[in-house]
A protein has these predicted regions:
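Secreted, disulfide-rich extracellular signaling modules
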Residues: 2-9, 13, 19-484
Length: 484
């Protein structure tokens, strides 16, 4: 056999993954005299279970979910709302030529009207690109003014209690019934290329009056210098929730407070003109927005040992215990470990959450830090896989580096603590680090740069449901190991 043939043969063996044990002794011209490489392909088996999703995960996204949905088969229900601050542009201003309506000097025209039109009013606009569920289903939305400031220096999680920031037992500031197919807008508007779905909520006129009075007063004009001053002195924000209805979740991308008012301006000839102006105060990435998500009825999926489940956002997730000692020992080097996770069929329904496109596989004890630091997978302690509709699975082609890291972390700890696996070291290590060999699966969404390359991953908080083969059925991991 010539050198070229030998090289090809070795490469073929190194990348071979099969279900049966195979051992080959390779030598010859590629190794020193007397050295033999033994390559073994094998299968090991991991165990898995369904666990409750961690509430202590940072949501690095501007999307806020609003609505309620009950899954027909399991009865699991998600109810979502959100808290939002409203930003004010630095050095916000209204044209100095604004004088008021009729003979009234600004702001005395607050008591006046222009024909049948209001001189001022305020709307809260909730903009969404899409929603989950029934487009004709109606839900009732309630709005509460925040009574406490959201602390910008504190981390908040999806289990945040809105009652800390406002009196959720009191009568709401306003309530409105809406559906995904916005009946408030004409069909001719919806077909426009620039159309963006929105929910418009009319707020009490007193909010517009308060803002305009504060702006017109020289002593309070500084309230509009920046967002912090605006929130501390005028509007701390709103809590928006679904109080009635079931079957729709809106994916809110932007919340805007619109203050509309009539005024008199003057043209170049100094003639008075009636004007309609609008000031906007935005809820966006520059101010805090927090999802408040609550699940009920997850007990059935948590107890189901015939499979494992992923239900997002923040419902349940799959935990896998990796057989580190079956895959790695001091005698062999682990060259490759392929993990394939196959989906299982679920009952069909008219409105069924989609299968997540991308799953993060990460060491369980690193999950919180990953999202808190706005990270990307390192292919050592975290990996990314996308769903293959052709094969109905997610494939992590090589997690050998993760197995090596788990194995070496334990070895280092045993050495530092003067223990061995044989003298109680294993039990001591597992007591101190019970999740040392555990990973979890979490739906994620990529944050892209200008070249459409992923620069980080954030939690995917859209509605997703995934049933995986596992639980009482072991998960096969195909390995290739070698030794001299």
């Amino acid at each position: 056999m010539n050198i070229k043939t030998t090289v090809c043969s070795i490469l073929a063996v190194l990348f071979l993954i099969s279900c049966d044990n195979q051992t080959s002794s390779l030598g010859g011209s590629l190794t020193p005299q007397g050295d033999v490489i033994t390559v073994t392909s094998d299968s090991c088996f991991a165990t898995s279970r369904t666990i409750k999703s961690s509430d202590s995960l940072i949501v690095m996204t501007t999307q806020c979910n609003l609505g309620r949905f009950t899954e027909q088969a399991s009865g699991a229900t998600i109810q979502t709302g959100y808290l939002t601050q409203l930003g004010c542009m630095e050095n916000f201003s209204i044209a100095d030529s604004v004088y008021g309506i009729g003979n009234h000097v600004f702001p005395q025209w607050f008591i006046d009207t222009v024909g049948t039109q209001k001189p001022y009013y305020a709307n809260l606009k909730l903009y969404y690109s899409t929603f989950f569920g029934d487009s004709t289903n109606s839900i009732k939305i309630e709005v509460f003014p925040l009574e406490r400031m959201i602390d910008a220096g504190k981390r908040y999680y999806p289990d945040v209690d809105p009652s800390y920031f406002c009196n959720t037992s009191a009568k709401p500031l306003v309530s409105v019934t809406v559906s995904g197919w916005n009946m408030q807008e004409y069909d001719s508007i919806r077909i426009d290329d620039d159309y963006y779905h929105s929910i418009s909520i009319s707020l009490p006129d007193s909010i517009a009056k308060m803002i305009l009075e504060a702006y017109s007063n020289p002593d309070t004009r500084h309230y509009f210098n920046d967002s912090k001053s605006f929130m501390e002195n005028l509007i701390k924000g709103f809590y928006i929730r679904c109080s009635q209805g079931d079957g729709t979740i809106f994916y809110i991308e932007r919340t805007v407070l619109e203050v509309n008012f009539k005024c008199i301006d003057f043209d170049d000839d100094n003639k008075p003109l009636m004007q309609s102006l609008m000031a906007e105060f935005l809820g966006n990435s520059e101010v805090l927005q927090m999802n408040s998500i609550k699940w009920t009825g997850l007990e059935e999926e948590l107890a189901d040992n015939s499979c494992t489940w992923i239900r997002s956002p923040f419902g349940v997730m799959t935990e896998i215990t990796l057989p580190v000692d079956d895959m790695r020992d001091d005698e062999y080097v682990l060259n490759s470990a392929m993990l394939r996770l196959s989906s299982a069929n679920t009952p069909s329904s008219k409105f069924k959450p989609s299968i997540p496109t991308t799953l993060l596989l990460i060491r369980k004890d690193l999950l919180q830090d990953f999202f808190g630091k706005n990270s990307i997978q390192d292919n050592v302690e975290s990996y990314i896989a996308t769903y293959s509709s052709k094969y109905g699975s997610y494939t992590y082609n090589n997690i050998a580096a993760m197995i090596e890291k788990m194995y070496n972390d334990r070895a280092d700890w045993l050495e530092e603590n003067g223990k061995t696996l044989q003298n109680g070291g294993l039990a001591a290590y597992e007591q101190e680090r019970p999740d040392w060999n555990k990973v979890v699966l979490v739906p994620v969404a990529a944050n892209l740069d200008s070249r459409s390359s992923a620069i980080s991953y954030s939690l995917d908080i859209n509605m997703h449901q995934l049933k995986l083969i596992g639980g009482s059925t072991p998960i096969k991991i195909k390995t290739i190991r070698s030794k001299f």
